[in-house]
Amino acid sequence: MYTASKERYTQMEYKRCGDSGLMFPKVSLGLWHNFGDTANFENMKKLCFTAFDNGITQFDLANNYGPEPGSAEKNFGRILKEDLGVYRDELIITTKAGYDMWEGPYGNWGSRKYLLASLDQSLKRMGLEYVDIFYHHRMDPETPLEETMGALASAVQSGKAIYVGLSNYDGPTLEKASAILKELHCPFVINQNRYSIFDRTVEKNGLKDMAGKLKKGLITFSPLAQGQLTDRYLHGIPEDSRIRTDGRFLKESTLDEHRLDQIRKLNDLAAQRGEKLADMALGWLLHHDEVTSVLIGASKPQQILDNVKAISCAPFTEEELKLIDEISA
């Protein structure tokens, strides 16, 4: 039986999620990869235990995480039942719905029927009565925003979620959604979006600025650009790289000579700062006031330990920030 470290809250730093009362660890653990049916269950447990022992209290899931869809929630539910569940009140457990999940017209996008059915399924897979945050996973161009936001509000009213969040939204849609949720007295606290030195979409589509204006949290996924912002590709593409075995999330064509040159220059800057590239990349995100937490993925416990070091990343000078922008342009 797992017993959590008594020192688990001594090193991690926590940040308020927007203007809510909820505190997030500056580093959170995502279960997007490495928690599906093809992964080793004992390793999954080690990842979760290492995270929690080091103050990571936020575990991020979605209905379709796997592979297969639903398997990450099922496996995490087993970890809760066998070990972590006794610490439930110390955990922030989140899930999402919005992508294709089951056959027929009711298993996708943002309808009230889909979202509430999906949440029920997620709770059953994890063996939970509620999640801390229920997200709509992506914007739906067809379903009225009022219906989707109303479904999120119903999830809270029914006691199946404490807070709600939005994922992969842009600034203008966030502003409209936030106004609807405020009218419904629904506790909307967080946005989740892809953001890294190499991916500035949230800067271009207004999401980051709008989150700050509305005083809502922002948790960033793919902060290391699927491993590009690490030392893994400094000397080209390793044969055992996920690119070689699974090109769904990072394509080999992305790592052309220009990108590899960018990675090497950023690595040189990190070395000048006395840091690893990954530490600098995570620290760069956390230096933005709008960013509440960075969402890391891991296949080995040591990766979690390494990423937690980012909270003590040295402050950036204006010259360094300008150079990062120039290199990554």
Describe the predicted segments one by one.
Residues M1-L91, Q157:
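N-terminal binding-site loop/beta-alpha segment at the start of enzyme catalytic domains
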Residues Y2-Y9, T143-A329:
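Beta/alpha (TIM)-barrel catalytic core signal, keyed to glycine-rich beta->alpha loops juxtaposed to Asp/Glu
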Residues G18-G36, T94-G107, Y130, Y135:
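N-terminal small/glycine-rich loop or linker at the start of catalytic domains
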Residues P25-L29, F59-L61, L91-T95, F134-H136, ...:
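Hydrophobic faces of well-ordered beta-strands that scaffold small-molecule active sites
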Residues F35-N40, N64-A72, D140-P144, G171-P172, ...:
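Acidic-and-aromatic substrate-binding clefts and catalytic sites of carbohydrate-active enzymes
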Residues T38-A51, G110-M126, L174-S178:
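Short, acidic/polar
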Residues A39-N43, S71, N75, Y106-Y114, ...:
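Alpha-helix N-cap and loop-to-helix initiation/capping positions
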Residues L123-T143:
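Active-site groove signature of glycoside hydrolases
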